């Protein structure tokens, strides 16, 4: 009896529900809703059934015109039916003849607007490689797999998710060309959606280094007759009164012959040959030569004979920091840079710095943790005045100067071209949003200096900028500058497997949604990341990597995770020297493809490589 009663009650409820439906205004459900509520009894012999379903689908929908319900009957899955139905409706005009419909459903040709296309072409009509649909670089896409889940936005394949009248397209890897159509075969016809129109040689993005003979050793032995800068300015003669006055206190190599007004590299600038130009006193410019690329280990090796691990194991923290900049132009702070008031100056360690030292001996922040207060006193927040928002991270290198990434200030594909009046910097902060009274300092900017050879068009090469503060900032327990590395420090620490530290207020994970509140941290985040071998960095991306960059992060098989993410850009990648206990800024958070993805790494501007440029700008404009 109990069993019978148990069956009767649901029956009564069902009858009551049916009566309610009959008397309601909306009686019928949409086909997709109705079919999703129907429970079907599973049948045996799945292999046989697959053949039957395929035959049913072909009979119902290829040989004849079918409905959504008939397709569902054949596929027995709402998800599979939705995928099929999207292609089927896209092939509406191709239903006769049969072979044309079959080709359309296969997806290797375009029918109508080409929304059916599911092929693997990833080159545009002019020959530009497509940007990954999941990537934000070089373009921020408004269309992605979240906004258009049924559009099959895989990898960087051409698609038509917005039913463009010109057919399948993609975002491009050229920052100057946001999106472009692809040349797709038209179903059943001997033609394509748009004709191929290859760009003229020399236009667009360089996907590989120039093939011409390269200049070794950063042009220090260069004896050519080039006498014009990359910006087309003529060089001043080295014997001119202006050039002589500027050269008087410079540490020039006497072996480099300064002939006429030819570009030379007398100070061993890692950026290569340069010359003085007319204009403001101290104006200079770099000259355009194709330099031989050197691996990071070779370029920073500086002729050291020691094995890096042995060098670190065998030395103690007694080496004093040697000042590099002129305090008249640089300002104060270099003499005790990298020594944090709440840690090194009190002989205390923070919670995770031991991990860095152990990595030396043993050989955007995602998966990071909250930083301790005073842990990164050189951290700067680059803040937009209107609308008020966090733009990027940055680093305090003296009481007058701040270092950041150039793309935080200038990146036309994202409509970025900020001036000093658009921005301010907040120094000494821990909280992301709260104003920290008596702790943080807010400073206005006097001038922004972007590297003259910053390459936003191709690969963010030389992604570096200096910002001069209107007034010197006072140091405190929470505000203190970081050191910039010399050659020996770079040689010792920039080794694959050695860990550095990234800090920032960027997103905690990658997101496409407008509601980013849940992925933004409340306080400064910190993560320790290992430097990655240069060949692995190069193999992880299609973007051309230069020796002004290095990459860091965990490999898929290492069992750990971590990365910088959106909002961390411009912030520091620092390492602590076991020789003198000072913290050095080795890199600037530059770019990455997504956040914390397997097989992808964060790329950082190589600060040591660009230190001579930093010095030249500060010497010229510091007083």
From Swiss-Prot:
Reaction(s) the record says it catalyses: Selective cleavage of Arg-|-Gly bonds in fibrinogen to form fibrin and release fibrinopeptides A and B
Propeptide: 25-43
Active site, per annotation: 407, 463, 569
Notes on activation and inhibition: Activity is promoted in the presence of negatively charged surfaces, such as polyphosphate and dextran sulfate. Inhibited by SERPINA5.
Entries under SUPFAM superfamilies matching the protein: GLA-domain (SSF57630), Kringle-like (SSF57440), Trypsin-like serine proteases (SSF50494)
Region (High affinity receptor-binding region which also known as the TP508 peptide): 552-574
Domain Peptidase S1: 365-619
Molecular-function annotations in GO: calcium ion binding; serine-type endopeptidase activity
Residue list for modification 4-carboxyglutamate: 50-51, 58, 60, 63-64, 69-70, 73, 76
Glycosylation sites: 122, 144, 417
A GO biological process held by the record: proteolysis
UniProt domain Kringle: residue ranges: 108-187, 213-292
Residues carrying the site annotation Cleavage: 199-200, 315-316, 364-365
Signal peptide residue numbers: 1-24
Family, similarity comment: Belongs to the peptidase S1 family.
Role summary: Thrombin, which cleaves bonds after Arg and Lys, converts fibrinogen to fibrin and activates factors V, VII, VIII, XIII, and, in complex with thrombomodulin, protein C. Functions in blood homeostasis, inflammation and wound healing. Activates coagulation factor XI (F11); activation is promoted by the contact with negatively charged surfaces. Triggers the production of pro-inflammatory cytokines, such as MCP-1/CCL2 and IL8/CXCL8, in endothelial cells.
Subunit structure: Heterodimer (named alpha-thrombin) of a light and a heavy chain; disulfide-linked. Forms a heterodimer with SERPINA5. In plasma, interacts (via N-terminus) with alpha-1-microglobulin; this interaction does not prevent the activation of prothrombin to thrombin.
Name of this chain's protein: Prothrombin
The species this protein was found in: Pongo abelii
Gene encoding the protein: F2
């Amino acid at each position: 009896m109990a069993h019978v009663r148990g069956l009767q009650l649901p029956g009564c409820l069902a009858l009551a529900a049916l009566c309610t439906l009959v008397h309601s205004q909306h009686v019928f459900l949409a086909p997709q809703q109705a079919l999703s509520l129907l429970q079907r009894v599973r049948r045996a012999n799945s292999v046989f059934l697959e053949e039957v379903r395929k035959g049913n689908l072909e009979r119902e929908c290829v040989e004849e015109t079918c409905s959504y319900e008939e397709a569902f009957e054949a596929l027995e899955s709402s998800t599979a039916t939705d995928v099929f139905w999207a292609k089927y409706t896209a092939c509406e005009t191709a239903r006769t003849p049969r072979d044309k419909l079959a080709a359309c459903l296969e997806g290797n040709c375009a029918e109508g607007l080409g929304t059916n296309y599911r092929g693997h072409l990833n080159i545009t009509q002019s020959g530009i490689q497509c940007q990954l649909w999941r990537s934000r670089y070089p373009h921020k896409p408004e269309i992605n797999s979240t906004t258009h889940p049924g559009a099959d936005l895989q990898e960087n394949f051409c698609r038509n998710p917005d039913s463009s009248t010109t057919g399948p397209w993609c975002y491009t890897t050229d920052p100057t060309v946001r999106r472009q159509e692809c040349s797709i075969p038209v179903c059943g016809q001997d033609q394509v959606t748009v004709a191929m129109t290859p760009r003229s040689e020399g236009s667009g993005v360089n996907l590989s280094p120039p093939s011409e003979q390269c200049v070794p050793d950063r042009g220090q032995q260069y004896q050519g007759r080039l006498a014009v800068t990359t910006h087309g300015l003529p060089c001043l003669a080295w014997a001119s009164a202006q050039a002589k006055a500027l050269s008087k206190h410079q540490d020039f190599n006497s072996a480099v012959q300064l002939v006429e007004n030819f570009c030379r590299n007398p100070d061993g600038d890692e950026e290569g040959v340069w010359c003085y130009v007319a204009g403001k006193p101290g104006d200079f410019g770099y000259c355009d030569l194709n330099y031989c690329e050197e691996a990071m280990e070779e370029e920073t090796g500086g002729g050291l004979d020691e094995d890096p691990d042995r060098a670190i194991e065998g030395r103690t923290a007694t080496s004093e920091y040697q000042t590099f900049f002129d305090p008249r132009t640089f300002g104060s702070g270099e003499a005790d840079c990298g020594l944090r008031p709440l840690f090194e100056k009190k002989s205390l360690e923070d919670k995770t710095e031991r991990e860095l030292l152990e990595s030396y001996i043993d050989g955007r922040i995602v998966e990071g943790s909250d930083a301790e207060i005073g842990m990164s006193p050189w951290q700067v927040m680059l803040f937009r005045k209107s609308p008020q928002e966090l733009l990027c991270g940055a680093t305090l290198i003296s009481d007058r100067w701040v270092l950041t990434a150039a793309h935080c200030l200038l990146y036309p594909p994202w409509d970025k071209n900020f001036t000093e009046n658009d921005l301010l910097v907040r120094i000494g902060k821990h909280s992301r949003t709260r104003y920290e009274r008596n702790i943080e300092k807010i400073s206005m900017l006097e001038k922004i200096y972007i590297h003259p050879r910053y390459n936003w068009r191709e690969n963010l090469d030389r992604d570096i900028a200096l910002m001069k503060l209107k007034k010197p900032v006072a140091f405190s327990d929470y505000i203190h500058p970081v050191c910039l590395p010399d050659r020996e420090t770079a040689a010792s620490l920039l080794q694959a497997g050695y860990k550095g530290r990234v800090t920032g207020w960027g997103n905690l994970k990658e997101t496409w949604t407008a509601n980013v509140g849940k992925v933004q941290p409340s306080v400064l985040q910190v993560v320790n990341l290992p430097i990655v071998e240069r060949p692995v960095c190069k193999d992880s991306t299609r973007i051309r990597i230069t020796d002004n960059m290095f990459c860091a992060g965990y490999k898929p098989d290492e069992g750990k995770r971590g990365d910088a993410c959106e909002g961390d850009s411009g912030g520091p990648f620092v390492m602590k020297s076991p020789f003198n206990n000072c913290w050095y800024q080795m890199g600037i958070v530059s770019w990455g493809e997504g956040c914390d993805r397997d097989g992808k790494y964060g790329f950082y501007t190589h600060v040591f490589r660009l230190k001579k440029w930093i010095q030249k700008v500060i010497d010229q404009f510091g007083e």
